A protein has these predicted regions:
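PRPP-dependent phosphoribosyltransferase catalytic core
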Residues: 226, 241-243, 248, 260, ...
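Conserved PRPP/pyrophosphate-binding segment of the phosphoribosyltransferase/PRPP-pathway fold
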Residues: 332-429
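A phosphate-binding catalytic loop at a beta-strand-loop-alpha-helix junction
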Residues: 452-469
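Short basic/glycine-enriched coil/helix segment immediately N-terminal to the Walker B
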Residues: 440-452
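Short mixed-charge
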Residues: 94-101, 195-216, 379-408, 520-529, ...
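Conserved short alpha-helical segments that host acidic/polar catalytic motifs at enzyme active sites
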Residues: 1-289, 295-358, 362-363, 372
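Hydrophobic, well-ordered secondary-structure elements that form the walls
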Residues: 342, 359, 459-460, 482
Length: 631
């Protein structure tokens, strides 16, 4: 499929021992810094536009920096920011670099709290000012806040309006910046609450500061900040006084995992990243429950706190299908199951002609689903072999057994992705021609005019890569029939929780449904849906439903599949083509624990998702449909 820009990646490390401990045990006080690099590099798939990191020292004296940040843009941003950090040590002697106490006193990024972020923009905004972590500075250590996250908020406009109505003047219109300011404001109030409490105890001067830093309660800050936001999020932060937290949204949309022992407390967006980095078992890693936060206090005390009640069980199923690393044990099993469940629909598509069918996949994320599909075909073939042997009225001869058992699953790597070529694809008139060569084929792998070619992908979103590249190169091998298979169901609805697909007209499934309604002369249904969406948008957001679902009630899955083939078939391609999508029931059977399926069903877990989907249809009608055909 065409690559999607999607949710970001986060990494946090809290060292629970002094730096000298790591110097003695691991030979370097940079243990935390090195582990942060690994956590970020292992999650490079989650963000290739920019990266950033921040660090807090617990033991500093006035006049010395205790909070550090480094950020960079580009696909090599991780390497760049860590190279910059290392440059800060370049003038130090080997003796100083091996001295943890010296590093603690004198070197930047020699701290106990580390936080990293990998960015994929879902808003189209670029520039270093939009790269996490964000930083809010103050002369009081406890009021300093560094914030990063994997999130996209659906109600940022409402929050912005509320802030401006109160007389505030935010400098930047973005969910990240507004969250920083809102949370920073609540952190200020929490510090001031402790200031008053310290004065009431008769404390003065630095004793007040010590009291504040010992008693500031980050859970209070989160409880007064996060209920304002609607969306999918994992929000991570560190304060200048040494508090660390990571909170997951109450719907469980975005993922977060943590691990703790007596040396470290760590958080990452994916389970296998923690397993690999710290050489631990799957069961050692815990999932952060929806609506809870992992909080590590200045003194190293770690706890899980309930910040908001869980509102739904809506963890993202698309995360399992496409975004997360397939090395996660449960994700690997789920992707195999998705592929295996497509066996029967594909058998029908090839008219059960397994002898003249080649199975393959589109690199690279569909590989695991392909293994599942192969397993399903092997099981079917074994059943056929047994039935054929049992049907004989005599003990089979060696020749008969050889003939029966020779009909096996045929599989080949037909498509190859030229990764280097993609980096040179230019904009403009030459783009489509260059894009058509991003994939290549294995020559002589298909018998022209005789073999069916089944090729599985993880999902089909826009259909651009199919149209511009894949169908053309597969057609050059002249198969009898091409069956393109999606391990995911039809993607019908936009996402507003961190994945870059917010417009309905981008989806080939939606475009096909609209074309079918036009052909059926059902313009009235399109107009009715538009009117219903507009009426829905006038309701309180909590009462809104998804009116866009009406569009799909008048067309069948098979009709949409055939229309997509018609729309995406490149000029000159003559080979018969058929699409096979995963069913919604198959999705739920393969991934039963992750019920967030709004991409496929329109069942948005949050009110803001419902509102934005209705607004997306209104935008489509007014900006696209009305230009093509008036009501």
């Amino acid at each position: 499929m065409e690559p999607l820009k999607h949710e970001c990646g986060v990494a946090m490390i809290r060292l629970l021992k002094p730096l000298q401990y790591y110097q003695q045990k691991y030979g370097t006080w940079m243990y935390g810094l090195n582990k942060l690099y690994l956590l970020m590099e292992k999650q490079h798939n989650r963000g290739q536009e920019a990266a950033g990191m921040s660090c807090v020292k617990l033991k500093t004296t006035p006049g010395h920096e205790y909070m550090f940040r480094e950020r960079a843009e580009g696909s090599n941003a991780i390497t760049e920011i860590f190279a910059t950090v290392q440059k800060g040590f370049a003038k130090e002697t080997p003796e100083h670099l091996a001295d943890a106490r010296y590093a603690e006193r004198s070197l930047p990024f020699a701290g106990e709290l580390y936080m990293g972020h990998l960015r994929y923009s879902t808003t189209g905004k670029s520039g270093l000012s939009y790269v996490h972590p964000f930083l809010r500075r103050n002369n009081w250590r406890a009021k300093n806040l560094s914030l990063c996250g994997n999130f996209n908020m659906t109600n940022i406009g409402e929050i912005f309006e509320r802030l401006t109505r109160q007389g505030q003047c935010p400098r930047i219109y973005s969910d990240s910046y507004i969250m920083l300011e809102l949370m920073g404001h609540r952190l200020d109030r929490e510090v001031e609450r402790n200031f008053v409490a310290a004065q009431a105890l008769g404390l003065t001067d630095t004793d007040i500061t010590q009291y504040i830093e010992d008693n500031v309660n980050v859970a209070n800050v989160l409880r007064t900040t996060m209920p304002h936001f609607d969306g999918g999020y994992v929000v991570c932060g560190v304060t200048g006084s040494g508090e660390m937290f990571s909170m997951r949204d109450p719907w469980g949309i975005r993922p977060a995992f943590y691990y703790k022992n007596d040396e470290v407390a760590v958080v990452a967006s994916e389970r296998p990243v923690l397993q690999t980095t710290f050489a631990i078992e799957c069961d050692d890693v815990k999932e952060l429950e929806p609506g809870t936060a992992l909080i590590v206090k200045r003194d190293g005390d770690c706890r899980i706190e309930r910040i908001m009640e869980q509102k739904a069980d809506s963890s993202c199923s698309f995360e399992r299908i496409y975004f997360s690393r397939g090395s996660d044990a449960s994700i690997y099993k789920e992707r195999k199951k998705l592929g295996e469940q497509l066996t029967n629909p594909i058998l029908r598509a090839i008219d059960y002609d397994t002898k003249n069918t080649v199975l393959s996949y589109i690199p690279n994320t569909a590989e695991v689903a392909f293994y599942g599909l192969v397993a399903g075909f092997k099981r079917y073939m074994r059943q056929q072999h047994v039935a054929q042997i049992q049907a004989l009225d005599h003990a089979p001869t060696a020749e008969e057994l050889e003939e029966i058992l020779s009909n096996t699953v045929r599989l080949d790597k037909v498509a190859w992705k030229d990764i280097k070529l993609r980096t040179f694809i230019a904009e403009g008139n030459s783009r489509n021609d260059l894009a058509s060569h991003v994939y290549d084929v294995t020559y002589e792998s298909i018998r022209a005019g005789k073999d069916n070619l089944v090729i599985i992908d993880d999902s089909i979103v826009r259909g651009t890569t199919l149209q511009k590249s894949i169908l053309r190169i597969l057609d050059r091998r002249h198969p009898k029939k091409i069956i393109v298979v999606s391990s995911a169901p039809q993607i019908r609805y936009p996402d507003y929780y961190g994945i870059d697909m917010p417009r309905l007209e981008e989806f080939c499934v939606f475009r096909a449904a609209i074309e079918l309604l036009k052909e059926k002369n059902m313009h009235a249904l399109i107009k009715q849906t538009y009117d219903n969406c507009r009426r829905e948008l006038k309701k309180p957001v909590e009462e809104m439903g998804n009116c866009v679902r009406q569009i799909y009630k008048a067309v069948t899955v098979d009709e949409i599949n055939r229309k997509i083939v018609q729309m995406l078939r490149p000029k000159g391609v003559k080979t018969p083509i058929e699409l096979v999508f995963q069913s919604i029931e198959g999705l739920h059977e393969a991934i039963p624990q992750h019920k967030g399926d709004w991409y496929f069903t329109g069942n948005y877990p949050t009110p803001g998702g419902m509102r934005l989907c209705n607004q997306a249809f209104v935008n489509y009608i007014e900006k696209v449909y009305q230009n093509e055909q008036k009501f």
